[in-house]
């Protein structure tokens, strides 16, 4: 069970994962050691799964963000998702209900790279029965922060 202090620590780290335990402790009026122990416990429980930099793909030359809706053979969903999660181009992957069996977000350098990615890595998967691609025109908000 999370208490008020745990939630405050999570909110602070959610906004700035580089903030030191000392800074967090000062902000909350608790010791650095208390913060360290709580973060360790939250990590061991799987609540904190990592600390990541938020990177703008366009500034690194990745111009294409594609949303792929995948139709997968029902008996092969788990196996196929495990293969897809290993692809570097896929930055988010979800098993879904509704029209698609899975939805993923892929980031690529350009349209040519997208075509190559689909032809060489997605379409050859024998368990993928089809794929609908939607290109992102602009990003107004990404999902990198939790609403806590």
UniProtKB/Swiss-Prot annotation:
DNA-binding region residue numbers: 21-40
Q: Which controlled-vocabulary keywords does the entry list?
A: Activator, DNA-binding, Repressor, Transcription, Transcription regulation
Key word Transcription present: yes
What is the source species? Methanocaldococcus jannaschii (strain ATCC 43067 / DSM 2661 / JAL-1 / JCM 10045 / NBRC 100440) (Methanococcus jannaschii)
Tell whether Transcription is among the UniProt keywords: yes
Q: Which domain of life is it from?
A: Archaea
Assembly with partners or alone: Homodimer.
Explain the purpose of this protein.
Answer: Participates in positive as well as negative regulation of transcription. Binds to its own promoter.
Classification from the root reads:
Archaea, Methanobacteriati, Methanobacteriota, Methanomada group, Methanococci
Annotated protein name in UniProt: HTH-type transcriptional regulator Ptr1
Spell out the InterPro entries in the cross-references: ArsR-like_HTH, AsnC-type_HTH_dom, Dimeric_a/b-barrel, Tscrpt_reg_AsnC-like, Tscrpt_reg_AsnC/Lrp_C, Tscrpt_reg_HTH_AsnC-type_CS, WH-like_DNA-bd_sf, WH_DNA-bd_sf
Q: Where is the HTH asnC-type domain?
A: 2-63
What would you give as a GO molecular function for this chain, any one?
sequence-specific DNA binding
